[in-house]
Amino acid sequence: INLNWTYQLNHCVWDIVFDPFNTEQLYAATTEGLYKTTNGGLYWSQRLDEFMVMDIEVNKLAPHVLFAGVGDLNSVNKGLYRSEDYGETWELMDNGLPPYTHDGRIMVTSNINNASEVITVIANAFSTVGIYKSTNGGDSWFELDDADVASYQGWYAKGALIHHENPNLILLGGVELFKSINGGNVFVQKTTYTG
């Protein structure tokens, strides 16, 4: 065991997910790219060399399909990326998504019971660019409601979830929590921050 640690400013891990069929295979979204391990974390190798990978989604039915949200103010090649070979190669998604000029975070979630249904939220630092949905695994996208889920913290704190039994129930969180009961057509703000 080596107890000689060094600290590097502004380097962090944003997200860690695992393959639901192989718990030895994990993926880490970091400030320095996306990393993969096939031996439970003993060794890691970079699989997406982009600055500020902030969110990862592994398809629960087809774990060879992954999505990675890349970007913040300083990212060059920001956008939503998809891999169809366990993270070995990546392509930038664009069919129906806006130009990647945002300076905030991209988050992504998928339907645990329908591999084709994916939702992404693209944000600026203090506001939402858009909420988008794909019903064909990311081949094309269409815009959902224009709720400002990312207000005040679009570069940092956000979460997204499609309910595992009722895919019409979607939760999106930032400073406030938003809920849709019709598959994302309308989101209603459920909380009010008063700090």
Feature names for model-found ranges:
Residues 1-195:
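Extracellular glycan-interacting surfaces
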